[in-house]
From Swiss-Prot:
E.C. numbers: 3.6.5.3
Region (G5) residue spans: 174-176
Annotated protein name in UniProt: Elongation factor Tu
GO molecular function: GTP binding; GTPase activity; translation elongation factor activity
Cited InterPro entries: EF-Tu_GTP-bd (IPR041709), EF-Tu_GTPase (IPR050055), EFTu-like_2 (IPR004161), EFTU_2 (IPR033720), G_TR_CS (IPR031157), P-loop_NTPase (IPR027417), Small_GTP-bd (IPR005225), T_Tr_GTP-bd_dom (IPR000795)
Pfam families on file: GTP_EFTU, GTP_EFTU_D2, GTP_EFTU_D3
Subcellular location field: Cytoplasm
Function text: GTP hydrolase that promotes the GTP-dependent binding of aminoacyl-tRNA to the A-site of ribosomes during protein biosynthesis.
NCBIfam families in the cross-refs: EF-Tu, PRK00049.1, PRK12735.1, PRK12736.1, small_GTP
HAMAP family: EF_Tu_B
UniProt-annotated stretches for the region G3: 81-84
Amino acid sequence: MARAKFERTKPHANIGTIGHVDHGKTTLTAAITTVLAKAGMAKARAYADIDAAPEEKARGITINTAHVEYETGNRHYAHVDCPGHADYVKNMITGAAQMDGAILVVSAADGPMPQTREHILLAKQVGVPNIVVFLNKEDMVDDAELLELVELEVRELLSSYDFPGDDIPIVAGSALQALEAIQGGASGQKGDNPWVDKILKLMEEVDAYIPTPEREVDRPFLMAVEDVFTITGRGTVATGRIERGSVKVGETIEIVGLRDTRSTTVTGVEMFQKTLDEGLAGDNVGLLLRGIQKTDIERGMVLAKPGSITPHTKFESEVYVLKKEEGGRHTPFFPGYRPQFYVRTTDVTGAISDFTADDGSAAEMVIPGDRIKMTVELINPIAIEQGMRFAIREGGRTIGAGVVSKILQ
């Protein structure tokens, strides 16, 4: 059977449901697909189908994630939902499922709970830029004042983590009632059923409030060097996958990391032994570089648009440390611990100087399974930017994953 061609007629965005356990994230995901399926803009997915999320690996870590896709009138969405809390933590830190925005699900009957807070904090630290709130289980709250109180509490909580709590759209509804309405024969048309309308209203807010992300190809050029070789009579070629942006023959680029930054001109772009005029984000290419010796460039450096990225050694990061059962360490570690930090294509040794818990207090040690903020100092400068992901390794095995939250020097 021929594979269906992916028609890219609408702008694309990646979103996901976040929030406390049992507040209705998966039911909402099922309700969105079921309601939109009525308009032919999604494939209806049942709760059980989403809940049985397949395992996947990201940066050496196993995570359970369900991926669904659907469309609204304006956009195409890829939506992720995780069955367990630990899966959210791992997913957001590894960036396995990048989110341009999130739907925070809060039970109107319970209000914000510990994981509500933790997911908002995580969203802030890993750089999920926009949040829309769905107050679920509205059918279980008889008192309109109570609903207003919960809304106020959610807005204050979001503001306390530097999200614009006063401006964030909050839609109240019931995912279960909407699902049951469609199963009971509701059309999915606006105005036919009040519970279905609330799901449609939520998607209108998501469409309007979460901005369309800049396409990778429109961002500044960056390619991590994977391999380097010499072509006799032509010069030095660096190969790798273009992470973002584009590169054309004749353009000036910088070689960043491990040594002093230097400029060079791209004299050729090749892919699969064919020459191209330009390489785009996602392409695996070889770039021929003018005036560069094979010894001047090595794996772990990046090629980038001049001035777009700089080398650093010291940064703050949010890290998830693998449990023993996940293949991680069996024992805790302390400040001064020196593992390898695997960034893009290479391992760099770094020392961990201090740990900070969520409440801002200093932690004395880190136990496998913890999520912690830590300050890292690498022995060699490499191209680092806020929001960049890395793995922490020890003797070649992954013991943790992290994301850069702040560059220090």
